[in-house]
Structures are given as C-alpha cells and as structure tokens.
UniProtKB/Swiss-Prot annotation:
Coiled coil: none
Species of origin: Cyberlindnera mrakii (Yeast)
Descriptive protein name: Small ribosomal subunit protein uS3m
Functional description taken from the UniProt entry: Essential for mitochondrial protein synthesis and required for the maturation of small ribosomal subunits.
Gene name per UniProt: VAR1
Similarity comment: family membership: Belongs to the universal ribosomal protein uS3 family.
An annotated GO cellular component: ribonucleoprotein complex
Compartments where found: Mitochondrion
Signal recorded as keyword: no
Keywords, comma-separated and alphabetical: Mitochondrion, Ribonucleoprotein, Ribosomal protein
Amino acid sequence: MTNNKKLYLYKLSSKAMNYSMDKNERNVLYLNKYLHEYNNKGTKLQNSNMMNSWNNQLYKFNKNEVINTLLTDKLVSKLLVKLFVIKEMGINNPSYLQGSQMGRRIFINRPKFKHTINTVYINFNYNDTNMKMINNKHTLYYGSLIKDINNILGCFNYKNHNNELFNIATYLSGLYNKKVMIMPNKMKYNYNDNVIFNSSISYDLDKYKGGLAGKTYSKLLRDNIPMNNSLSIKNNYMTNIINNNNIKYNNMISNNSLNIKDIYKSFDINKITNELLVNKYLIGLSMLFKGKNIKKAGVSRSIKEKLLFGSLSNKLYRKNSGLLVYKNNNNTTKYLNFDININKKYKLNYMPNHHAISQLSKVNKAKTGVYGISVKLNTI
C-alpha cells in the first residue's frame, strides 16, 4: 500500500505528464533522477544524513530509511507547491475577476519537515499577490478558496485538531505510517519571508520598465517596505529592559524570603510586550539582479543591478550615541558624559544580525537568456 502511494507521488511530481510514456516507466525515470541526485553527494551522505537541516529535521536511524524519508519529503514538497501555485484563480469564475485580477497568484515557500517517532510536522509559509479586491464577491470567493485548500490539505486546527475526513493529511499519514500535521502560515506581507519575496520580485519584474533599478519599481519597493527608525527601536528595547528589572526588584524588596521562582512570578507570557520579539523589525534589505535584460531583446551583454535599503548590520549605534549635548547661555556646546556607557550597559551594539538569504537563478523570462535574483533581509 505504501509503495503504491509513493509511486503516485512520483506521478504527481512528474513534469512529463503529457509525454506518451508508460506510467511505470515514468515513475522509474523520476525515481532514478532523485536517487542519482543523492548518489552524487557521496556514499556517506554527509549532506543528507543530518540531524537538523534547514528543511528536514529527522532522527538518525538507518541510512536507507533516511534516504527514503528525504525522497518522500521532496515529493510531498513538490505536491504542496503545485497545489498552492495558482496562477489564474478566476478561471472558473470570470465574472468575479477582471483584467490583471485574472493573474492573482499564491506564493509558497519550500515546506519544512520535522519527523518525530509518532508524528510528521509539515510547516510552510504562503502569501497571495497584493492586488485590490474588486468587490465583495471576489473577497468571498478568495476566502472560500483558501478554506477549500485548508480542507483539502487537512490543515491542523488548534481547536478542532485535524479534520478526520479523507484529505491529504490522512493520505500522507498512510504513506509515512505516522500522524501527519500540516500547518500553513499565511504571511501578511511578502517581505516577511525571503523566498516568497524573491519569487514575487521575479514575478513582477516584467510588469515594470527599467528592471529592478528602474524608477517605477524601486519607488514601489521603497513605498511598500517599511524601514523602522533605529532610534525608536533602541528606546523601546531599553524601556522594556528597565521595566522588567523594576518588576524583579520590587518582588525582591517586597519579600526577602522569596525563592528564585517567585521573583519572576509576575512575568506572564501574555503580558510581555511584543517589542522584544526577534525578527519583528525589518532593518534593511539588499537585492541583486544579474543576467540578461528582460525588456530589451537582442542585447547580448549581461547587466548587474543592486539595490540597498536600510542597513544590513544591527550595530546601529555609534560610540558617543549616549552623550547628551546642550548649549550654555553663552552659546557654547557642552557634553554630559554620565550616559556615555549606555551601549555597554544595554548591549545595544551586541544585537545579532538575522540575515535571510534567498537566491533564484536561471529564470527564463528574459528573451535573450536567463537571469538570477538574490535577496538578503536583515531583521531585528
């Protein structure tokens, strides 16, 4: 039963569905393709047999089983991507959509798999193209479509848990011989995920003249991507540290017999401000376009364009940022150095950089060749 399901996954992930090839031959062809890919990495599988890779977390047991699990994960990943990449959502309801709305698309990041003894967790991010709704009917249609996709996948619900009806989650449970929990995360903005952001840039480039560095598209990026004020981040960070220290201090002086657990009893996860959450603020981003020009056919020379917004380093505070400057009555400038160690006290220059890098290469949209896009996001 499991082998039949795995062969069916190979069939779904096949790109040669229209070829006049026998079903079994096509399955064997793609099975050999994936096996050849892993065999090229060496017999010891240093690149595959890992405890915690970025997209697959699984425990080490048998080498052959690890290979089979990774192959199955890759096939399931292709299946989920095919389900979510919907290029023309209004094809069955043309009265709801007009013009450019016919090209509405859902972008999905590569699913991440976490294997435990009894459960397989599948987590991925997705985002739809940012287009205006025409009317309420379109809004209802889009909402019902996402609901239908969730029902088909059997997505995990924290209230009702998994839908017990036959869906992809139950189908994959029979394939893995474990319970499968699918948990999609809808991104509010495309720049919340570097892979989705990269895909959306490639999707939009051919709509604007001038390419990545053109006035129209670069202005659109600057207007839609927030670059938060580093000074406000510093002040919020310091204020939260001071408030938390005051809570601990008040608990200690109110009762000297308190244990270490009682000192922190006032901290509630629901009360902790979200200003301290990692990856909340987008500090800067860098985009690199390299390859053939999309708009100009017949140009053989490759071009290279790079955009930089904000900063890719979180060391935003200079050495003397803690100094207080004021002027006397005689209009002379003086410095108060009582606050000179503010960076050392609150470790403002020790915030780690969170770089998310995504590369999209060999895109065949250019008439004269291919191009590649690299996106780097820095968050704090």
